[in-house]
């Protein structure tokens, strides 16, 4: 077993193999509290291109004190369909049964996303399998495409889940973030308007049956993640952070557990590089709580300041810094032009648009997709992320870090330019 010890710990879990061009991309990370186990997933590809994905690989890590012992890399051959490549891992832990559900898409052969968008012919299947022993063994794959999407698929040019973790709400609902390219009109045999929109797949019966939520509109949104945060008088609100091509991150809120979202808004504190990039978000209850926050001019921001993103039903209680001490933690490249310098941001008042901190830089240099996990009750977080010396697809690293390190950037002004 490979051991990573003490805090702010870093280890390479998946390394590009230069001789045979094997590349690992699209990280997904899950922490399972009862067994103190991490599951780290990635796509194995024969090149960096999306259409050269083959199957998923994973590693199991066990927390021992403030260290993680990692087992060997394993191919997840159970997560395959004949004649398809497996992509976009999205795991979620169901606390009542102890099952780990792993969602993914299986895409026909080497059919590219561009081809699907050009012809309006979806080549992806919505699939999942589950483990009842924290990833030691896996069941058979199940194709949910017809059951969950059905006839609506004729309006989808293509789609994907995640990538990165899903969540279970306090109500028990399981949520798998996703996005689809919607075809709004055709000209002869070609779709003339195809735009991506985020949505949720969900289950209210512990994963027995699954359903499709409504699209986040009208803003173009893609790869996304969600986190549950407190709203008014115990009302729980779902926060969604979504990729856009429009220079800034899109944020949207749901008051019905992810079936429907309000109109998304671009947050100008959270930049996107050219073309956008996937990012990760989690909710957490930090062990250390600062009492004030500053705006961009350096003045204290009142804790009761209302967020222009939300309607009156989402307002937090009077006097709340975060009403129950729940924060958001967000990982994303911080450079406005390129996928560089992976940052960790926090928001101590999740429904307030102006409360995002400056980023604490987790990785300097090329940085791509990432996925966050919370080690509950220990003030620790984990991040699985793409990085490298020259390109962000050279390796996928795991880092364990503390809330104290994130809070070292303890003001809430806008991120500086990169």
From Swiss-Prot:
Its EC number is 3.2.1.18. It is found in: Cell membrane; Membrane, Caveola; Early endosome membrane; Recycling endosome membrane. Its main location: membrane. Palmitoylated; may regulate intracellular trafficking and anchorage to plasma membrane and endomembranes. It catalyses: Hydrolysis of alpha-(2->3)-, alpha-(2->6)-, alpha-(2->8)- glycosidic linkages of terminal sialic acid residues in oligosaccharides, glycoproteins, glycolipids, colominic acid and synthetic substrates; a ganglioside GD1a + H2O = a ganglioside GM1 + N-acetylneuraminate; a ganglioside GD1a (d18:1(4E)) + H2O = a ganglioside GM1 (d18:1(4E)) + N-acetylneuraminate; a ganglioside GD1b + H2O = a ganglioside GM1 + N-acetylneuraminate. One of its GO terms (cellular component) is recycling endosome membrane. One of its GO terms (biological process) is negative regulation of clathrin-dependent endocytosis. The keyword Methyltransferase does not apply. SUPFAM superfamilies: Sialidases. GO terms for molecular function: alpha-sialidase activity; exo-alpha-sialidase activity. Expressed in brain, cardiac muscle and weakly in liver. The active site is at 50 (proton acceptor), 369 (nucleophile), 386. Keywords: Carbohydrate metabolism, Cell membrane, Endosome, Glycosidase, Hydrolase, Lipid degradation, Lipid metabolism, Lipoprotein, Lysosome, Membrane, Repeat. Substrate binds at residues 25, 45, 179, 181, 223, 243, 339. It is a peripheral membrane protein. A motif (FRIP motif) lies at residues 24-27. Pfam families: BNR_2. BNR repeats lie at residues 129-140, 201-212, 252-263. Exo-alpha-sialidase that catalyzes the hydrolytic cleavage of the terminal sialic acid (N-acetylneuraminic acid, Neu5Ac) of a glycan moiety in the catabolism of glycolipids, glycoproteins and oligosacharides. Displays high catalytic efficiency for gangliosides including alpha-(2->3)-sialylated GD1a and GM3 and alpha-(2->8)-sialylated GD3. Plays a role in the regulation of transmembrane signaling through the modulation of ganglioside content of the lipid bilayer and by direct interaction with signaling receptors, such as EGFR. Belongs to the glycosyl hydrolase 33 family. Interacts with CAV1; this interaction enhances NEU3 sialidase activity within caveola. Interacts with EGFR; this interaction mediates desialylation of EGFR enhancing downstream signaling. This is Sialidase-3. The gene is Neu3.
């Amino acid at each position: 077993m490979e051991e990573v010890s003490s805090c702010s710990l870093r280890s390479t879990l998946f390394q590009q193999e230069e001789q045979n061009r094997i590349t690992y991309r699209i990280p997904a990370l899950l922490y399972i509290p009862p067994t103190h186990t991490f599951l780290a997933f990635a796509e194995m590809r024969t090149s960096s291109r999306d259409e050269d994905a083959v199957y998923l690989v994973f590693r199991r890590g066990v927390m021992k004190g403030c260290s993680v012992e990692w087992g060997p890399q394993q191919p997840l051959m159970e997560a395959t369909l004949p004649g398809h490549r497996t992509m976009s891992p999205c795991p979620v832990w169901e606390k009542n049964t102890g099952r780990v559900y792993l969602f993914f898409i299986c895409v026909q052969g080497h059919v590219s996303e561009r081809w699907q968008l050009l012809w309006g012919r979806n080549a992806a299947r919505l699939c999942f399998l589950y483990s009842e022993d924290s990833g030691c063994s896996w069941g058979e794959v199940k194709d949910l495409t017809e059951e969950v999407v059905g006839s609506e698929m004729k309006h989808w040019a293509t789609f994907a889940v995640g990538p990165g973790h899903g969540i279970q709400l306090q109500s028990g609902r399981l949520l798998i973030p996703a996005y689809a390219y919607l075809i709004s009109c055709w000209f002869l045999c070609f779709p003339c308007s195809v735009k991506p929109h985020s949505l949720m797949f969900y289950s209210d019966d512990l994963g027995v049956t699954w359903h499709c939520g409504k699209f986040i509109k009208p803003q173009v949104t893609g790869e996304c993640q969600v986190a549950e945060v407190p709203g008014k008088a115990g009302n729980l609100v779902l926060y969604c952070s979504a990729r856009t091509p429009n220079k800034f991150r899109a944020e949207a809120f749901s008051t019905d557990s992810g079936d429907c979202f309000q109109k998304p808004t671009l947050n100008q504190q959270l930049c996107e590089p050219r073309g956008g990039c996937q990012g990760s978000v989690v909710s957490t209850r930090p062990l250390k709580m600062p009492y004030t926050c500053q705006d961009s001019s350096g003045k204290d921001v009142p804790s009761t300041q209302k967020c222009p993103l939300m309607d009156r039903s989402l307002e937090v209680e009077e006097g709340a810094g975060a009403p129950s001490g729940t924060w958001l933690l967000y990982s994303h490249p911080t450079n406005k032009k390129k996928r560089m310098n992976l940052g960790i941001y926090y928001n101590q008042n999740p429904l307030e648009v102006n409360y995002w901190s400056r980023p604490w830089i987790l990785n300097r240099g090329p940085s791509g997709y990432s996925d966050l996990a919370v080690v509950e009750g220990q003030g620790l977080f984990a991040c699985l992320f793409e990085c490298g010396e020259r390109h962000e697809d050279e390796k996928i690293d795991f880092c364990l870090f503390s809330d104290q390190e994130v809070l070292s950037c303890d003001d809430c002004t806008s991120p500086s330019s990169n």
